[in-house]
Amino acid sequence: EGKKIVTDELHLENRDKLCVFHVTPDLVEKITNGTPTPPMCEVLAKNIGIRRATGDIICCVNLDVIVPPREHIDLMYQKLEVGDMITLTKQDVELEDLKKHFGDKTDIQHLMPVIFGVWPIQKRLMIPILSMNKELMLKQPEDNHHVCASIIQACGDFQIAHRKTWYEIRGFEEDMTRRLYHDTNVQYKVIMSGGKILASNTPHIYHIEHERNNTEENTNVIKHSYPSTNDEDWGSIKYTI
């Protein structure tokens, strides 16, 4: 109590240090020196973070997102109820543009809307309403459930919910080890457990644009998992060397 949150104290001293690493089997061999390591993927990493978080409100955000100022986030979740989840639409920005406008500065959250503006939510909106619950979902054909659960395109860059909500749905499905769709699936689980998803474009989040590999072998299959297929040890490394 009274201590500063660790992530509030993190600053990138030199933005030029941001690099792209191409992870290959040879690179992994070099880094690990051949030592067996626990299998890891995005969903497991997120779940480990959720299980280790200590607050009542847990925010899951991607590494390549510039989040809003803390005071804006604090205002956003004041009316968030247990069982519900908030997702924010992102706005893409180029790394070169960040360097051009800010150089090595890292305290830039308040300036982002001034420099880059704010996209209207319609730019990423997937359904014509900004919330979804189980009653509405069950009125839709099953083929539309994925779109209805997403609400906005790229819904998973910022999701916030009460700790009890994350634990009720057992986090992200840990068998979805590839790219895409696990964020929509976690929102589907919230909806089908009786909660609702609320989507907004405020406060504003900005995503550092990057290359993508959405080939079939790197992409999850769309699925709807409720109840969760995760076991009671979700969010832990189940691996013995």
Positions of the model-derived regions?
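Short, charged/polar "capping" segments at the starts of alpha-helices
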Residues: 2-7, 95-96
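Active-site-proximal specificity loops/subdomain of glycosyltransferases
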Residues: 6-52
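Short glycine/serine/threonine-enriched helix-capping/active-site loop
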Residues: 23, 86-91, 200-202, 206-208
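Conserved glycosyltransferase catalytic-site signature
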Residues: 42-47, 65, 73, 154-156, ...
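Conserved catalytic core of nucleotide-sugar-dependent glycosyltransferases
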Residues: 50, 68-174
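Short beta-strand-to-loop acidic/aromatic patch adjacent to the donor-nucleotide binding site
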Residues: 55-68
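C-terminal catalytic/acceptor-binding lobe
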Residues: 147-148, 153-155, 175-241
